[in-house]
Curated annotation (Swiss-Prot):
This is Acetyl-coenzyme A synthetase. CoA binds at residues 190-193, 313, 527. Its EC number is 6.2.1.1. Acetylated. Deacetylation by the SIR2-homolog deacetylase activates the enzyme. Keywords: Acetylation, ATP-binding, Ligase, Magnesium, Metal-binding, Nucleotide-binding.
Length: 654
């Protein structure tokens, strides 16, 4: 194995950093040995209407966790109200850059405060109360941030659905969370192309068993030619928020620390997406504290997280983390390749971005474009880079460090999940030396362990590998799967008793650094977004020609993992490119373009045990081009199937 490179923070960065290595070690020790004391102190970063009576109450074996019992606060108050009586009132809160470079808008903290108050009153006018769900299906426009903050102001639970999801995927989320109201747009733009949103909502509601009485529509494209309007249900956002009789102030609801804040759907290893439920106090503290330390935020910084708010990264590190810290956050509607592959670098120069947080997928795609676009831009404003969504391979790390950061910007390679709410394992810039490809060390209060398949902790010195689990609760952890407490326990706490199981594998090196090795369950990480194998398989078998399908992940140069589908057709059906196109189309229709298979491998049959279980381990290896060391195949009902799949892989998919 090649010698690991260690990258130390520069003397200048260390001098001005929010934390030193010595302080990290002592604070981390306190956070593990005395979590009550540590978190009681850190909770003072937030404004509470009423102080808690108990910091932590938990029974991890039975998945019961409660933080800051009795404490009362409001998220929108912490993100807005407490800033507008300070000089932050006129500071940029959201810097919006449209899909088209000619469109941009800056909203100060007071601008956002004003809009959030008004829209909170609109929601109340249409019957939304504390505890009601509001489903949000919007493009990356300021109204998306305004809508979710307005929900938090009145105690409504928001559930944002990524605008790239299909009407069917949208319908499943409507059926599950039963929203009182939906906020959408007439459409959106992505890479210069219009995208359907209102039409998708119409289709989803037609098929849904839920009777949603109110749909509020933001005008984004202005194209009303194909817009279907249902009087008495559909209302224009700008008419409602511009109502002269609307009160300009909405008193923030006093929320219990454990009151639900939002539901965000994520893929699981079974077919049905699960609604990850986050609560108010612990979540906000987690994103507030991590944002301060991980991104080394300073009052004058302009910070840009490129994630869509439809994913957890956008919730935590575009909206709630930055705004609760009084930071200026860039919000980008577009894609890195439009109008050309220099768009990211243009935005950085346009706004003097200091901190840039993006996904390895984007970095790898931009690496492929060569240096032409980068060399035309300045990028001298950058001082810190971040990576999120999947492990970053050392080659991409080095390119990011040398070409984008000019070897002066530390990189925070952050490991966390929708379920964890906030960053769990990361370097702290200026404090923790980095190793390209390693997520490095745990954040305060996070106690990662590696366990073997029997659930025993692996405490050996030196390099070890195992299942990555968390040993004790942290404030921003999910509190449940919405409406399904059994699934919450079964998914995260049943496999290794007394531990939260992340679903990831990892290795820990001799220095205690963690290296994430990928999913160990049936979830595929495509461009940092989780796609459940079962979801894609269910979509494929909807085609009448398909008898059976098995879907696995395989290494992909750009996306990290691609989707590899083994498909068995029914007797007498011809396999051809037309059928392949039909299968790709049905996956796009049922889930969305993000889940389209990269490879469709026609399989005469699948490797199964005598009990009928598909041996996915073997399918993963074949998809990855690993034909040796397939393990024991003697338990297969027909071992010859494996050789046929290998031959076809070599012949047609090499």
């Amino acid at each position: 194995m090649a010698k690991e490179r260690i990258v130390l923070p520069s003397a200048e960065f260390k001098k001005n950093s929010n934390i030193t290595l010595k302080d990290y070690k002592s604070l981390y020790k306190e956070s593990i040995e005395n979590p009550n004391k540590f978190w009681a102190k850190e909770a003072n970063r937030l404004t509470w209407f009423k102080k808690w009576t108990k910091v932590l109450n938990h029974d991890f074996k039975n998945a019961k966790v409660e933080w800051f019992k009795g404490g009362k606060l409001n998220v929108s108050y912490n993100c807005l109200d407490r800033h507008i009586s300070t000089p932050l009132k006129n500071k940029a809160a959201l810097i919006w850059e449209g899909d088209n470079p000619s469109e941009s808008k800056v909203l100060t903290y007071y601008d956002v405060y004003r809009e959030v108050n008004r829209f909170a009153n609109v929601l109340k006018k249409y019957g939304v109360k504390k505890g009601d769900r509001v489903l949000v299906y919007l493009p990356m426009i300021p109204e998306l941030a305004i809508t979710i903050l307005a929900c938090t102001r009145i105690g409504a639970i928001h559930s944002v659905v990524f605008g790239g999801f299909s009407p069917e995927a949208l319908q499943s989320r409507i059926d599950d969370c039963k929203p009182k109201l939906i906020v959408t747009a007439d459409g959106g733009f992505r890479g210069g192309k219009p995208i359907e949103l209102k039409r998708n909502v119409d289709i989803a509601l037609e098929k849904s068993k839920e009777d949603v009485k109110t749909v509020i529509v933001v005008r984004r494209t202005g194209n009303e030619s194909g817009l279907v309007w249902k009087d008495g249900r559909d209302y224009w956002y700008h008419f409602l928020i511009g109502d002269p009789d609307l009160s300009p102030y909405c008193k923030p609801e006093s929320m219990d620390a454990e009151d639900p804040l939002f539901i965000l759907y994520t893929s699981g290893s079974t077919g049905k997406p699960k609604g990850v439920l986050h609560t108010t106090g612990g979540y906000l503290l987690g994103v507030n504290l991590t944002f301060h330390y991980v991104f080394d935020i300073k009052p004058e910084d302009t910070y840009w997280c490129t994630a869509d708010i439809g994913w957890v990264t956008g919730h935590s590190y575009l909206v709630y983390g930055p705004l609760s810290n009084g930071a200026s956050s860039v919000m980008f509607e577009g894609v890195p390749s439009y109008p050309d592959a220099g768009r990211f670098w243009d935005v950085i120069d346009k706004y003097g971005v200091n901190i840039f947080y993006t996904a390895p997928t984007a970095i790898r795609a931009l690496m492929r474009e060569g240096l032409t676009h980068v060399q035309k831009r300045n990028l001298s404003s950058l001082r810190l880079l971040g990576s999120v969504g999947e492990p970053i391979n050392p080659e991409a790390w080095e390119w990011y460090f040398k070409i984008i950061g000019k070897e002066k910007c530390p990189i925070v390679d952050t490991w966390w999940q929708t379920e964890t709410g906030s960053i769990m394992i990361t370097a702290l810039p200026g404090a923790i030396p980095q190793k390209p490809g390693s997520a490095t060390l745990p954040f305060f209060g996070v106690q990662p362990v590696l366990v073997d398949n029997d659930g025993k902790e692996i405490n050996d010195k030196g390099e070890v590998s195992g299942n990555l689990c968390i040993k004790s609760p942290w404030p921003s952890m999910m509190r449940g799967v919405y409406g399904d407490s059994k699934r919450f326990f079964d998914t995260y706490f049943s496999q290794f008793k007394g531990y939260y199981f992340t679903g990831d594998g990892a290795r820990r090196d001799k220095d205690g650094y963690y290296w994430i090795t990928g999913r160990v369950d049936d979830v595929i990480n495509v461009s940092g977004h989780r796609i459940g194998s079962a979801e894609v398989e269910s979509a494929l078998v909807e085609n009448r020609s398909v008898a059976e399908a098995a879907v696995v992940g395989f290494p992909h140069d750009i996306k990290g993992q691609g989707i590899y589908a083994y498909v068995t057709v029914k007797e007498g059906i011809a396999t051809n490119d037309t059928l392949k196109k039909e299968l790709v189309a049905i996956v796009e229709k049922v889930i969305g373009k993000i889940a389209r298979p990269d490879v469709i491998h026609w399989a005469p049959s699948l490797p199964k045990t005598r009990s009928g279980k598909i041996m996915r381990r073997i399918l993963r290896k074949i998809a990855s081009g690993e034909f040796e060391g397939l393990g024991d195949t003697s338990t297969l009902a027909d071992p010859s199937v494996v050789q046929k799949l290998i031959e076809d892989k070599r012949k047609f998919h090499s």
